[in-house]
Amino acid sequence: TTPAPAPAPVRHAFTRRSLRPVNPLKELHDLAGLFPEPADAPLFLNARHVAREATPEPYRTMLVHEHHMTISMESWHHCSVDVEVLESRFQDGLYLRKIRLLKSGTSRVVQFGYVRFNLELVTEPVRREILEERVPLGRILIQHNVFRHVELGAILQFTAGPGLAHYLQMPAEADTWGRLATIFCNGSPAIDLLEITAPLE
């Protein structure tokens, strides 16, 4: 068999201040560390960086693109999604939050993740709606016609620990997939994301 291709280097950081090379696993731990889990219930047992072209279906379709995950989730699940903000706070002038996306009107979780956002890069109406924590971030940016683009950073495979099993309603020690991405607003890196999908059938 042909060996799986090695992951390509990540071209820039998912960083609030500058573009620089990073280790995706370090960035993963930095984002997950914004809201640490208890030591006896870690978020994941293992995580590895996987080349985009080695990502299996259906996760490749779900994750390997430069679009908002809100749109991908709604397309895949054939319904709108709601956001549930589990925790949020400000740190060093940045807005941080831990979230889940749910199939609209249900308790079915489809995505878990972390957001690190420099709100200075969007207008006051956009900031206000984001801080209300009622509408998914991607939908707000689209509805306000914010000039933006999504840059995919890295694809990650996870073995769920008790934390991820709880948040995604999945078995512990089972695998799922996620990604690191950056959203640029008005030409500047504004939003760092860790987005992990619930297991797909």
What label would you give each PLM region?
Residues 11-96, 100-177, 184-201:
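N-terminal domain-onset segments
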